[in-house]
Amino acid sequence: MSNLSGFIKRLRDIMRNDAGINGDAQRIEQIAWLLFLKVYATKEADWEWEDENYQSIIPEPCRWENWAAQKNGKEMTGDKLLDFVNNTLFPTLKNLPVDADTPIRKAIVQTTFADANNYMKDGVLLRQVINTIDELHLDDYEESHAFGEIYETILKELQSAGTAGEFYTPRAVTDFMARMIRPKIGERMADFACGTGGFLTSWL
């Protein structure tokens, strides 16, 4: 992804026109759950390729490719999209059957949506946001690695990391600290105040 700032600006400009979005914290949460589903769909495609018996924890109607992915102008939008997201997608993902034996890569869906919210009230604008995110090609090596920077870029672009409950440490600082620590293969590292994972990324 060559222009993360431009990508975030497009999303921000669309969401600014939605009456349901009130402040940067809500913008971040709205973008986050949509990005999660887009990335998860890409990962599931990999898992299905690796294991022909793989079964998604997400019911078919709620999988990204079946409700969010662009379909030559035939995708859901407007009130129909809002009704689906609010009354089908969220209730379904919040109440996925998860127990101690559920693999983490499946349980993470329910965990992610347990406290998530759809703040957008305009289904047409929501469709525009979804289409913008759907344009990401996360199967591309460079773009999938750039995804790790998207959340940090959101915080910087919205200019309110602190008030949104997240504090961003510049990449130059995390890289410098990793060089000073000089991590070695076999060592363990923990960031007990992990936010966007910048220190962990630099460690790797």
Residue ranges and their predicted role:
Residues 1-185:
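Non-catalytic, mostly N-terminal accessory regions of nucleic-acid modification and defense proteins
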Residues 186-193:
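Conserved class I S-adenosyl-L-methionine
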Residues 196-204:
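Conserved SAM-binding loop of SAM-dependent methyltransferases across substrates and taxa
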Residues 154, 194-196:
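Short, small-residue-rich loop/turn micro-motifs
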